[in-house]
Every structure is written in structure tokens, then in C-alpha cells.
Regions:
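N-terminal membrane topogenic signal
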Residues: 3-19, 215
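Interfacial segments of alpha-helical transmembrane regions
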Residues: 78-96, 147-155
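Alpha-helical transmembrane segments of multi-pass membrane proteins
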Residues: 21-38
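Membrane-interface transmembrane-helix boundary segments in multi-pass integral membrane proteins
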Residues: 11, 51-54, 172-207
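Membrane-interface loop-to-helix entry segments
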Residues: 56-59, 118-131, 191-195
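Juxtamembrane "helix-exit" motif on the non-cytosolic side of transmembrane helices
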Residues: 34-39, 105-114
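Non-cytosolic membrane-interface motifs at loop->transmembrane helix junctions
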Residues: 44-51, 85-86, 112-125, 148-150, ...
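Alpha-helical transmembrane segments in multipass membrane proteins, preferentially the mid-helix core
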Residues: 130-146
Length: 218
């Protein structure tokens, strides 16, 4: 499999570096808000960490920040970072972060109203990182590097997340998103929502890969 870092461009390094700084900064500040909020509420720091790591936005942005860091560093990394530079992994992150932005804007922005610095972090995680990372994917993944089987990581990542959220909800009784809240809408509705989101992920991944593959013929 081709490695984007084998022939890095200045544009990839610059954009990846920008995304790494933006992503990690927003994630760290958001973690601080979550932990301190739950300490204030008497739930404790561990509960704050649990709530923080329950959001697909956070996990996907963490993956994107890791990929961006690996691309920014290029060959100056150890083997674990090499995995994050694989075209299939970059593509999985791109599909997920694109849908993070779209789903938040369409379904969640009217029920989420952060203020101050937390609002700035929200803008970074939901509105800046998604388009910038998709652009990074487009210029970082070499032409001809992707085949259709490379979409499996893009589908596996949200599928594993859905199982994680449902298992965590059974144990802790908390769900990060209303469309996954079994206690309010029941398992039947949650499964229908999961099926619908799965179809969206599959369609998005297929369209993105088709566009990327079509660019090789130009």
C-alpha cells in the first residue's frame, strides 16, 4: 500500500501541521471543560472523562488530529504513527469527520449552545476541522492508492463506536446523542437510527472513493 509520507508535499505538511495544532488544542480545552464541569457537579473527574470520550465528535477529531500529526511529521515517526499515514486510515478519518460536521449542523446544533471558549472549540471541532481534513485527505492520499476494500476501516470505525455507545449506555445509563438514547426512544428506534446512519456512512464513503478514483483518469 502506498504511503503518502513517501513523497510529502509542502502543502500537505503545512495543512497537516495546522490541523494538528487546531485539533489537539480544541480537544485538550474541551476535555478540561468536561472534567471541571463534572467535578463542579459532584460527579468527579473520572465521570467527566467518561462523558468526554462518549462523543463521536471527540473520538473522530482525535483520530484526525493523530493522522494530521503523523502527516506533518512525515518520516520522522515510529511505526505506530506509520499506520495513521495509510491511505485507508486517512480515508476512514475523512469520511467520519465529514459526517461529524454534517450531522452536527443538521441534527444537533439547535440543542447544543456552548458559550465563550467552549463555543470556539465547538466551531473548531464541528466547522473548521471537517472541511480542512477532507481537503487534507484529497491532497495527501496519492492517486491510485485506494481500492474499494480500503473502505472497510471507514465503515468499521462508526460501527465499533455504535456498539461502544450502546454497551456503555447499558452499564452507565448515559447516551451521548438523542438518536442513540435507548431510555427515551427505545431499542427499535435506536436500531433504525443506526441503520440509517450506517447507510449514510456507506454512501458517503463510496462517493468519496469514487471521486478520488475518478481523479486518476484525468
Amino acid at each position: 500500500m502506498l504511503d503518502p509520507a513517501s513523497a510529502p508535499s509542502a502543502a500537505v505538511h503545512r495543512l497537516a501541521g495546522l490541523l494538528a495544532v487546531l485539533g489537539w488544542a480544541a480537544l485538550i480545552v474541551q476535555a478540561w471543560f468536561s472534567i471541571t464541569r463534572h467535578i463542579t457537579l459532584g460527579n468527579g473527574a473520572a465521570y467527566g472523562v467518561m462523558m468526554y470520550t462518549g462523543y463521536f465528535t471527540i473520538l473522530t477529531n482525535t483520530l484526525c488530529a493523530g493522522v494530521a500529526t503523523a502527516l506533518a511529521l512525515g518520516g520522522r515517526t515510529t511505526p505506530p504513527w506509520h499506520t495513521l499515514r495509510r491511505p485507508a486510515v486517512i480515508t476512514a478519518a475523512a469520511v467520519s469527520i465529514l459526517l461529524v460536521g454534517v450531522i452536527y449542523h443538521l441534527l444537533l446544533r439547535d440543542i447544543h449552545h456552548p458559550v465563550g471558549l467552549e463555543r470556539a472549540c465547538n466551531v473548531v471541532l464541528h466547522y473548521l476541522v471537517p472541511p480542512l481534513f477532507v481537503l487534507l485527505w484529497w491532497i495527501a492520499v496519492p492517486r491510485g492508492a485506494l481500492v474499494w476494500r480500503d473502505l472497510w476501516p471507514a465503515f468499521a470505525f462508526p460501527a465499533v463506536y455504535a456498539l461502544y455507545v450502546l454497551a456503555r449506555g447499558e452499564l452507565a445509563g448515559v447516551y451521548p446523542y438523542p438518536f442513540f438514547d435507548v431510555t427515551k426512544i427505545g431499542y427499535a428506534s435506536v436500531l433504525w437510527n443506526a441503520a440509517g446512519l450506517s447507510a449514510v456512512f456507506v454512501a458517503t464513503g463510496c462517493v468519496m472513493l469514487a471521486l478520488k478514483r475518478s481523479s486518476t483518469t484525468r
